[in-house]
Amino acid sequence: METNKLYECTLIIDGGLQDEAIAAAMALVQRVITEKGGSISSVLEIGRRKTAYPIKKKTIGYYAHIEFTAATSVIAEVEKVIRYEEDLLRYLIIHLTSALLEMRKRVEKYSVVIGSPEDSALAEAAAASDTVAK
């Protein structure tokens, strides 16, 4: 029996579609993962963004990330279904190793969101140190 591993699937769905069609494409991917024996741990829908370059003559994409656990044999079956879905512009499935998870924890620990109270405190501290140095 294969052991389940943690994966992340990043999707770019055609941003020109109606919200119902985007929801249907997301539901399709999630359904395929669960039907093939995987279990979804988190879904992060980022929303519509401008792409860096045209993909299939589209410049707006709907970005989403799905974290799931599945056996390695499931990935090929999921990719087979995703590959032929016309509404999906791009997809990438990666195996989340312990090194990647550790790096993600460090980034979350030390990152500061611009405009947050922590960011304001850092900016004030930097300004105070600049005036003291002069």
From Swiss-Prot:
<dbReference type="GO" id="GO:0006412">
    <property type="term" value="P:translation"/>
</dbReference>
<dbReference type="GO" id="GO:1990904">
    <property type="term" value="C:ribonucleoprotein complex"/>
</dbReference>
<dbReference type="GO" id="GO:0005737">
    <property type="term" value="C:cytoplasm"/>
</dbReference>
<dbReference type="InterPro" id="IPR020814">
    <property type="entry name" value="Ribosomal_S6_plastid/chlpt"/>
</dbReference>
<dbReference type="InterPro" id="IPR000529">
    <property type="entry name" value="Ribosomal_bS6"/>
</dbReference>
<keyword id="KW-0687">Ribonucleoprotein</keyword>
<dbReference type="InterPro" id="IPR014717">
    <property type="entry name" value="Transl_elong_EF1B/ribsomal_bS6"/>
</dbReference>
<keyword id="KW-0699">rRNA-binding</keyword>
<dbReference type="InterPro" id="IPR035980">
    <property type="entry name" value="Ribosomal_bS6_sf"/>
</dbReference>
<keyword id="KW-0694">RNA-binding</keyword>
<comment type="similarity">
    <text>Belongs to the bacterial ribosomal protein bS6 family.</text>
</comment>
<dbReference type="Pfam" id="PF01250">
    <property type="entry name" value="Ribosomal_S6"/>
</dbReference>
<dbReference type="GO" id="GO:0005840">
    <property type="term" value="C:ribosome"/>
</dbReference>
<keyword id="KW-0689">Ribosomal protein</keyword>
<dbReference type="GO" id="GO:0070181">
    <property type="term" value="F:small ribosomal subunit rRNA binding"/>
</dbReference>
<comment type="function">
    <text>Binds together with bS18 to 16S ribosomal RNA.</text>
</comment>
<protein>
    <recommendedName>
        <fullName>Small ribosomal subunit protein bS6</fullName>
    </recommendedName>
</protein>
<dbReference type="GO" id="GO:0003735">
    <property type="term" value="F:structural constituent of ribosome"/>
</dbReference>
